[in-house]
């Protein structure tokens, strides 16, 4: 298993809390539930198969996520895959500091996970291709 956390230097550290990269993580459980914590994330999936968001009660798939997506502030918990067999790069933002990177008001993204192409600049979206070239 690989799990790396990088704290960016100035000026990115004013906005980004950390970069997280992981692969070959294989927990025994299949789903995770994340409580609302006021954070926002850009998730870059480095695999070719979709990840899902599940209904919190029935655990039925309610949304598919591919390549790059943005996860807004939550007011309720979210149920997602545990990360088994995933390879991801996650950008964790400081609370309230996402605005330079997402081209949409944050209040419109509360409780939503949206395709990166809908809310992010081309430069952010191109990060996935750059990361794939590096690994």
Spans of model-derived segments:
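Alpha-helical bundle regulatory/interaction domains
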Residues: 1-135
């Amino acid at each position: 298993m690989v799990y790396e956390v990088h704290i960016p230097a100035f000026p990115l550290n004013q906005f980004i809390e950390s970069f997280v990269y992981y692969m070959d993580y294989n927990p025994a459980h299949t789903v995770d539930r994340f409580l609302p914590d006021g954070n926002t994330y850009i998730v870059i999936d480095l695999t070719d198969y979709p990840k899902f968001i599940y209904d919190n009660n029935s655990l039925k798939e309610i949304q598919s996520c591919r390549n790059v997506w943005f996860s807004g502030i939550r007011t309720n918990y979210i149920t997602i895959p545990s990360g088994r067999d995933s390879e991801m790069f996650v950008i964790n933002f400081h609370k309230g500091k996402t605005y330079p990177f997402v081209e949409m008001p944050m209040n419109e993204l509360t409780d939503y996970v949206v395709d990166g192409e809908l809310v992010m600049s081309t430069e952010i979206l191109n990060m996935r291709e750059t990361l794939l070239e590096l690994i």
